[in-house]
């Protein structure tokens, strides 16, 4: 598995990204519509997009207790055709080295997870993220805040 930055030439492939449960995330096509201060990242296996996420360098990170050198992880998902194969955790484990190489000015990743999304909370804890004391009221309810130092 590898991760890399999204390119406009990937748009067609994202059209066929299967994601029907949008309770806790947005579809990648929606997410790439606004990339100001954001980096779209793809997880690929044999040139097939299996995961997607946004690293947001904008002001929203401060809502979650982020610092100027933090990135807010948003819109993280695994294509439904590839779920339960470990690609989500592999993507998260590859992120720190990717950021050190391509975005070295950032020193942590911060994110919010809806309290009802226990699968995601477990995934973040298992991949090295630390639960922070604050909670945020997000669009779909209360969110736990997690951070990973890079």
Predicted regions and their residues:
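Extreme N-terminal starter segment of soluble prokaryotic enzymes
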Residues: 1-2
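Active-site acidic-Proline motif in GNAT/NAT acetyltransferases
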Residues: 79-85, 115-116
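Conserved active-site alpha-helix within GNAT-family acetyltransferase domains
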Residues: 89, 115-133
């Amino acid at each position: 598995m590898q991760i890399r930055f999204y390119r406009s030439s990937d748009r067609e492939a994202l059209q066929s990204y299967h994601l029907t449960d949008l309770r806790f995330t947005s579809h990648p096509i929606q997410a790439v519509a606004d990339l100001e201060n954001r980096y779209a990242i793809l997880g690929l296996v044999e040139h097939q997009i299996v995961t997607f996420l946004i690293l947001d360098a904008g002001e929203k990170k401060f809502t979650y207790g982020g610092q100027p050198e933090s990135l807010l992880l948003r819109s993280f998902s695994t294509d439904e055709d590839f779920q339960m194969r470990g690609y989500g955790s592999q993507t998260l484990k590859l992120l720190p080295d990717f950021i050190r190489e391509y975005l070295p000015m950032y020193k942590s990743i911060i994110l919010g997870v809806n309290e009802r999304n226990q699968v995601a909370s477990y995934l973040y804890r298992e991949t090295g993220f630390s639960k922070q004391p604050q909670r945020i009221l997000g669009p779909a309810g209360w969110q736990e805040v997690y951070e990973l130092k890079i």
